[in-house]
Amino acid sequence: INDSNYGNNILLTSDAATNIMKAGIIAAKRDNKIGSDGIADQAEIMTLRICTREGEPYLKDMALAIHYAVSHGADVIVLPEQNMLYPEEQKQWIIHELKEAEKKGAIVIVPAWNTSIDMDKVEFFPNRKMSKDKELTNLMIVASSDKKGNPVMDTNYGANTLDIYAPGTDIYSAYMGDTYRTGTGEGLAAATVAGVATLIKSYFPKLTGSQIRDILLKSVTSRKGVEVEKGIRVDDRPSQDLFLFDDLCISGGIVNAYQAILEAEKMNSQKK
């Protein structure tokens, strides 16, 4: 792509409120007794506006925004939710920029869609295997868990394609107009993982995005062997079934910030 401009100047989109909540989850100031505490309040948020007023963002804008973020030193990149429709030319744009992010050591975090679909059987984009010549090691797909540590019923899942679950139900965070609100959604779960990734990077800046992904996978609160109820689709109709948690995602668990820092410390000491 030869363009340098991306996105639009539309301030109030259908995703504006959610994106403010994501920023609050990641980096709201801690211990000031106002609203909520962010996970990594030393983070600097780079806001790149690609959302349209309604509907999905244009993939060209997304590719250019990733390029801008990587070129300006972003360590953690959060994308909009996965999508099923990636025309070949536009898919190659995204692949190229994700590879550049990988080379520069950035981790890219993507919320799964909430359509109760097994992503091992139906391909969603972006994903780690979308490039024919190599698997992307810095890309992480996240779905939402509830307060009891169970997967939200309508989240997508996949033993080989979904990386990790994270709290995404009834999350209190910053909102529009200097207010605070409780929200639910895959994007908030992805922001939680992004916050933990940012925390790791702040303590151990030499770790790469690929290493941080490995750390997050290894340090989960394990739910392996736990049977949970999960929404599915049968002949394109919603239904429900019982699964072992480890049959729903690669890590078999829920992100754990404390354990992630311990794992990062261990990996960092091995590098010396």
Where is each model-derived feature located?
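C-terminal subdomain of the subtilisin-like protease fold in secreted/lumenal serine endopeptidases
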Residues: 70-81, 104, 137-141, 204-272
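Substrate-binding/access-modulating region of protease and related hydrolase catalytic domains
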Residues: 5, 9-12, 50-136, 178-190, ...
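Structural recognition of the beta-strand scaffold that forms the well-ordered cores
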Residues: 24, 37-38, 44-49, 70, ...
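Aromatic- and histidine-enriched alpha-helix N-cap/loop-to-helix transition segments
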Residues: 17, 57, 188-192, 249-255
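Extracellular S/T/G-rich loop segment that most often corresponds to the catalytic His/Ser-adjacent loop
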Residues: 128-202, 206
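Extracytoplasmic/secreted envelope proteins and their assembly/folding machinery
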Residues: 19, 23-26, 63-66, 95-98, ...
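Active-site/binding-pocket entry motifs
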Residues: 31-32, 51-52, 83, 146-148, ...
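Subtilisin-like serine protease catalytic core
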Residues: 1-58, 137-138, 148-149, 157-161, ...
